[in-house]
UniProtKB/Swiss-Prot annotation:
The gene is mntP. This is Putative manganese efflux pump MntP. Its main location: membrane. HAMAP family: MntP_pump. InterPro entries: Mntp/YtaF, Put_MntP. GO terms for cellular component: plasma membrane. One of its GO terms (molecular function) is manganese ion transmembrane transporter activity. It comes from Desulforamulus reducens (strain ATCC BAA-1160 / DSM 100696 / MI-1). The chain crosses the membrane at residues 6-26, 34-54, 67-87, 103-123, 130-150, 159-179. It is found in: Cell membrane.
Length: 180
C-alpha cells in the first residue's frame, strides 16, 4: 500500500469525526476541550486498527455493530439535548460542552473510530507496516477532529444564538445516518 493510499484511507476514516465535531464545536467548546477530544479520537484511531488486527473477524463484527448502535444513540441524545437546550425557556447564555463525562467522551471516540477497527482486519493482508498505518490514521483523525471542533466553534460564534440548534440538527442527522 502506498503512502498516498494510506493517507487517503486515513482521511476517509477521519471524516466521521470531522463532521461530528463541527456539530459539537457549534455547541461551544474551549481550547482544553478541543485538545481533549482531539487527543482521545487520535488515540482511538491508533488503537482500533491495532485491535482489529489482533482481535479477528468475530469480535469485530459483534463489537462493531453494538458500538455503532450505541454511537448512533449517543448522537441522537446529544443532538436532541442541544436542540432542547436551544428552544427551552430560561436557558443560560454560556457556551455548553455537550460531552460532560469521561464515558461520553470514550463512547464518542469509539463510535467515530469503529471503521478503523474494521480496517485493522484488512491491513494484515496488505504490504504495509501496521504501526505506520495506525499512526497515520490516528494523526489524520486527530487533526480532522481538531479542525472540525475549531471550525464549529467559530461558525457557532458567527451564527450566534441559534448555532446550537444547527449543531443539534447535524448530530441528529449523523445519528440517524448511522442506523442505515
Amino acid at each position: 500500500m502506498s503512502l498516498f493510499t494510506l493517507f487517503a484511507l486515513a482521511v476517509a476514516l477521519g471524516t466521521d469525526a470531522f463532521s461530528l465535531c463541527i456539530g459539537i464545536g457549534i455547541a461551544g467548546v474551549n481550547r482544553r476541550q478541543i485538545a481533549l477530544i482531539s487527543l482521545t479520537v487520535l488515540i482511538f484511531h491508533i488503537l482500533m486498527p491495532l485491535l482489529g488486527w489482533y482481535a479477528g473477524g468475530f469480535l469485530g463484527s459483534k463489537m462493531g455493530q453494538a458500538a455503532s448502535i450505541a454511537g448512533a444513540l449517543l448522537l441522537l441524545y446529544l443532538g436532541g439535548k442541544m436542540i432542547w437546550d436551544t428552544i427551552k425557556p430560561g436557558k443560560d447564555e454560556g457556551p455548553r460542552f455537550v460531552i460532560t463525562n469521561t464515558g461520553g467522551l470514550l463512547l464518542l471516540s469509539a463510535s467515530v473510530s469503529m471503521d478503523a477497527l474494521s480496517v485493522g482486519f484488512t491491513l494484515g493482508t496488505q504490504q504495509v507496516s501496521l504501526v505506520l498505518a495506525a499512526g497515520v490514521i490516528g494523526l489524520v483523525a486527530g487533526m480532522m477532529t481538531f479542525a472540525g471542533l475549531t471550525l464549529g466553534k467559530y461558525v457557532g460564534d458567527w451564527i450566534g444564538e441559534r448555532a446550537e440548534l444547527v449543531g443539534g440538527i447535524i448530530l441528529v442527522g449523523i445519528g440517524v445516518k448511522l442506523f442505515f
